[in-house]
Amino acid sequence: MKNDSSTSAAPMKGLVGPLRSSEPARALPAVPPAVYLLEEAADLLVVHLDFHAALETCERAWQSLAEEPTSGTVVEVKCSLCVVGIQALAEMNRWREVLSWVLQYYQVPEKLPPKVLELCILLYSKMREPRAVLAMADAWLQDPDNQGLPEYGSLAELHLLRVLLPLGRLSEAEGLAVGSAAFSEEQREAVLQAICTARQQHTREHLSSQEQQQMSQEGSFSHKLMSLLRLLRRLWDAAASHLLSQPFKKSLLAALILCLLVLRFDPATPSSLPFLYQLAHLFRRIQKATLSRLYPLALRD
């Protein structure tokens, strides 16, 4: 019992100091229920690995804080609840819901605590989706109330390195590095060196992509040309084989005769009759000569 009483009295001594006989006892400040819910959520997250229950506990704690007056303790508890909730969402592979989940409590990006914004930038940068957090970080950094915070310089550097440079927004990164007074000389020099390196890499990648595109176009043109030549060759082979075939020769001869008869000679005109008679006589002679070679005995009889 002695140990229990001394242990329970230790927090009271730290909070209100030693009591004197002449001083009236002062009441301890009430601890918001959200503090106990925060401890429960952290325990569920870290010890039990029950991420869904940890997230629900954070949401219940936020609801209980809606009726609490704003104080330093409440602000810290809200920030810690957001940190636990973000980690729970990330563990459940629901990291895309983090921004909307955070903004439902803080309404606007400018009101986010620096720790929460830092965690969002790191999360979306790790998942290779820095564009999702770009607008939020820009709004927070441009807010005049945030520019006086001690965390502003580190967040600006983090935003520059993890968001602007991966997105290729080199001009914005350079403007932030040069125009912001939050950077020290060492930070500014390191950031400008990183921007220069990123610009050189971007130039090399651009030239490489152009070369690959040019080679692809040349290869495509060569492929199309070879395909066209093969097609022409097949057409030429087909036409040559068709021209050399016996039925086509007969058809061509018949078509030539028809053209001579129809286009140059009108059977209705008297001038075409002698030619027609001669042509018919020629055909009869050819027929007679052919039949005489085939059937010589029959013709002699």
From Swiss-Prot:
It comes from the Eukaryota. One of its GO terms (biological process) is protein import into peroxisome membrane. It is a single-pass type II membrane protein. It comes from Cricetulus griseus (Chinese hamster). One of its GO terms (molecular function) is ATPase binding. This is Peroxisome assembly protein 26. The chain crosses the membrane at residues 247-263. One of its GO terms (cellular component) is peroxisomal membrane.
